[in-house]
């Protein structure tokens, strides 16, 4: 691995690239295979593939707005992504867990940013539901990576507090 003092934990960006590529390939696949809102049941009453476009943020927040939200969410994603790269670069050698968490969040943010900038919406295709009574909003691999990375960040904060260490950052 390159000199950690010079590059920080930037070599962990391979995870970011992997998340981005898997996210974009999966979105392209489901756009080619499914029509809008078509469902393919994978596990009855629990899990399906579907195709949905989200012009808003998480849970379709502001999706009904006139289009300005596309640029707002893109700007937020760019600022957050730049901040994550700086944070990643400043990590020390022993902060591997945190490096992986940041790389996951960054990969997901960039995957959804690409959709938003190029397509004008985010492509979602994973649908978790319970029978026909409850549906979680459709999501994608980028959203999953962001969620896993965020949980890892939260666990890192709790671990740091419990051991009496200063919070990473």
Curated annotation (Swiss-Prot):
Belongs to the peptidase A8 family. It catalyses: Release of signal peptides from bacterial membrane prolipoproteins. Hydrolyzes -Xaa-Yaa-Zaa-|-(S,diacylglyceryl)Cys-, in which Xaa is hydrophobic (preferably Leu), and Yaa (Ala or Ser) and Zaa (Gly or Ala) have small, neutral side chains. PANTHER family: LIPOPROTEIN SIGNAL PEPTIDASE (PTHR33695:SF1). It comes from Pseudomonas aeruginosa (strain ATCC 15692 / DSM 22644 / CIP 104116 / JCM 14847 / LMG 12228 / 1C / PRS 101 / PAO1). The keyword Secreted does not apply. The keyword Cytoplasm does not apply. Keywords: Aspartyl protease, Cell inner membrane, Cell membrane, Hydrolase, Membrane, Protease, Transmembrane, Transmembrane helix. Its main location: membrane. Changing residue 143 to N: Loss of activity. InterPro entries: Peptidase_A8. Residues 1-9, 90-96, 155-169 are cytoplasmic. GO terms for molecular function: aspartic-type endopeptidase activity; endopeptidase activity. Monomer in the crystal. GO terms for cellular component: plasma membrane. This protein specifically catalyzes the removal of signal peptides from prolipoproteins. Disulfide bonds: none annotated. Its EC number is 3.4.23.36. Changing residue 115 to N: Retains 50% of wild-type activity. This is Lipoprotein signal peptidase. Residues 31-67, 119-140 are periplasmic. The chain crosses the membrane at residues 10-30, 68-89, 97-118, 141-154.
